[in-house]
Amino acid sequence: MLELKEKIGTLEKNDVKIATIMALLMGTFFIYIGKLPLAVTFIPGLVISLALIYFMYAKQLELPSAKSFVPLFFASFAWQFIHFNEEFVTGFYREFPLLFGSHPYSVERFVTINMISYCVFSLGCIIVFTQKLKFLVLPMLFYIVYGMIGNAITHTWWSLLHWGYFPGFYTAQGYWVLGFIVLSRFLKSRKATVLTFIGFALIVLPLITLTEWYHD
């Protein structure tokens, strides 16, 4: 039977090493299955997630207790299904790749990318807090950094940039709040959370904007 461990402790050197290898594998998968659109969106989110792991290791920050974090994580994760529904019914899988000069994703590819990701995110959280395999904080952090914070920033930016609704915009607004709450609980620092928001915006917004203009 799986039992939540209340005290997870800090990241160790091996956790960081394995997380780095995982980041390379995840990045390769994203580029393979999603091509340029995921290369300019998911990869920066992955790099920032890995940077937070190095930050936590350098500062020897203890991971939050299962009681304080796991229910919050899955409550916020439930919102992702609502967000996915909005993206699906409004044609995000068609509009998103077109921004970068790529062909629209098939329904099968779009659903596969999301369902595999959701499986990894949820299992990662469960395993971290039951088996203490702390290197699996990487997929958890990636969901928080890109799936929450990234969605809030990019969907808002695309709607502003195009002066109109962009698929997924409405439900993405919830992630401004959820992303801040979940990451600040995980890092135990509001300052680090705000800097993550700012850092993501400074890196990703120019990248996606210039890439879109180039292919326009």
Feature locations, PLM:
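Membrane-interface helix-boundary motifs at transmembrane edges
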Residues: 36, 58-70, 129-138, 185-196
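N-terminal membrane topogenic signal
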Residues: 2-22, 37-39
